[in-house]
């Protein structure tokens, strides 16, 4: 079963414009995220972007990149790539571009879940800390 990871990267981020290329150490955030995703058991990792500057940077560090039209959310951007890849892909995992410290083992757990339950949707989550539950910028999952 072919599983790919699509990493949406938006240059015009509302809260932090240019976020994909924000430097963490000596690498841009999107490169860290891509490298972690590449360490997983996914068959392919693709960056979906809307900006020439992000596209060029990702190509430079070796990523496969697909240009996507304007989208309101990262999930919309992932769906744009999904529509192009549906013929040869069984599962798509959406890893947000601002997850430079994501653990590849956690991605592998999601891969195991979707392979075992192909008619289900899986989402990684963690417990909220402190006032995160009230922060509109923190995504919440109801379990």
PLM features: residue spans?
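Short, high-confidence coil segments that cap the C-terminus of an alpha-helix
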Residues: 42, 87-89, 116-120
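Residue-level preference for the first positions of well-ordered beta-strands
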Residues: 2-4, 91, 121
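N-terminal glycine-rich phosphate-binding loop and ensuing alpha1 helix
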Residues: 2-49
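Short beta-strand segments
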Residues: 8, 94-96, 124-125
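Conserved core of the sugar-phosphate nucleotidyltransferase
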Residues: 103-143
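Short phosphate-binding loop-to-helix
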Residues: 46, 52-95, 99-112
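Short glycine-rich anion-binding loops that position phosphate/pyrophosphate groups of nucleotides
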Residues: 11-13, 97-100, 128
